[in-house]
Structure formats: C-alpha cells, structure tokens
Amino acid sequence: MPKLLPAQEAARIYHTNYVRNARAMGVLWALFTLCFSILMVVTFIQPYWIGDSIDTPQAGYFGLFSYCIGNALTGELICKGSPLDFGTIPSSAFKTAMFFVGISTFLIIGSILCFSLFFFCNAATVYKVCAWMQLAAATGLMIGCLIYPDGWDSSEVKRMCGDKTDKYTLGACTVRWAYILCIIGILDALILSFLAFVLGNRQDNLLPSDFKVESKEEGNE
C-alpha cells in the first residue's frame, strides 16, 4: 500500500469525522422524530384543547373530536364524540382541524416508517423524503391550529364556556395543554424538517471534492 501523502491523510481524517458527525446527527434526528410522533398521537387523541375555568357555567373540556360537558343537575361529565362518526363532532371547524392534524400525525408516523428505507435506498433520498413529509406535517398542524378556534361559536362550546364565547373568542374557558403542545409541534416539525434537509445534503456531499479527485488519481496510477 503506498504511503499516504499529508494532504491525502488529512482528507481521510476529515472524511472520517464528517461521516461520524453526520451519523450522530442522524441518530438524534431519528430519536427526536420518534418522540415527536408520540407527542402528536397524544395531542390528537386527548380532549384537552380547551376547558373550563372557575367562571364557566359547566365543567368540561373539548378536543379535536371528543368532548365532555358536566350535567347541570348532577355535575357528572357526559362525554361524546368519535373520529369515526363526524355527526358527533359539534363543529365543522373541529372536523376540519381534526382532518389536518390527523393527516399531520400520519405523515410524522410515515416518516418513521421510512427509516426502513435506509437499508434499501440512498440515504440522502430518504432524508429528503422524510423532510418533505415533516414539512407537510408542519403545514397541516398550522392549518389545524388556525381553524380550530373557528368552531368555538358552536352551541356545545357556548353551553360550557358561556354566551360571550364566539369564533376566536373563548369566553370564560381556557386553552389547555393539548392545544399548546400542538402549536409547539409546528415549530418542532419545522426544525425536524430543516435538520432532515441538512442531513440529506450532507449525504450528497459525504466525500470532500479534493479527496475524490486524489482517490481517482490513485486508481489511475
């Protein structure tokens, strides 16, 4: 084996560190994506987007599709709503928000399923596919969060939050943790998408150009 020149040796060291850093970033991105998918499933299912306060006429809380409102006589919570039965969802805005947040959740889960493609396809391509899926998920979450308050004027929400409740005006009710997490999820999805694009470009440029040239020259010799 011919003795490496200093420039070639430096290029190999650079390449080794470059690959190691790219793999470490890839592992972190995958872990964050997995955690984010769990967060999105919880946000989609849990009915804690808005809820009662000490000033509301009735106790209760609302989610994207399910909600619970207290009985005026007994105080017992009566729960309704199902993602499979649109007729039980109290507002068309809630239905639309559920659709977009649901699609976003499936896109994030789909990006995790794409991890298996790393064994069969070019890594840069897989990263970029996941990046576009996560960017689309961020868009869906943004639309869902913007549309959801449009349904606050429904009769069921007014029964819990009071007559002062209207579109984008919550009256006596308060925003709950699931809605806040969904808003934070928009930023999370954008960051994950940006990181995936960066990782995809790093894979495209995995080898330094000078190292590629020198390697070709060695092969010709």
Swiss-Prot record:
Name used for this protein in its record: LHFPL tetraspan subfamily member 5 protein
UniProt entry keywords in alphabetical sequence: Cell membrane, Membrane, Transmembrane, Transmembrane helix
Membrane topology qualifier: Multi-pass membrane protein
Xref: InterPro entries: LHFPL
Keyword Cell membrane: yes
Keyword Transmembrane in record: yes
Top-level taxon of origin: Eukaryota
Protein family according to the UniProt entry: Belongs to the LHFP family.
Species the sequence originates in: Gallus gallus (Chicken)
Parts of the chain on the Cytoplasmic side: 1-24, 120-128, 201-221
GO biological process, one term: detection of mechanical stimulus involved in sensory perception
Annotated transmembrane regions: 25-45, 99-119, 129-149, 180-200
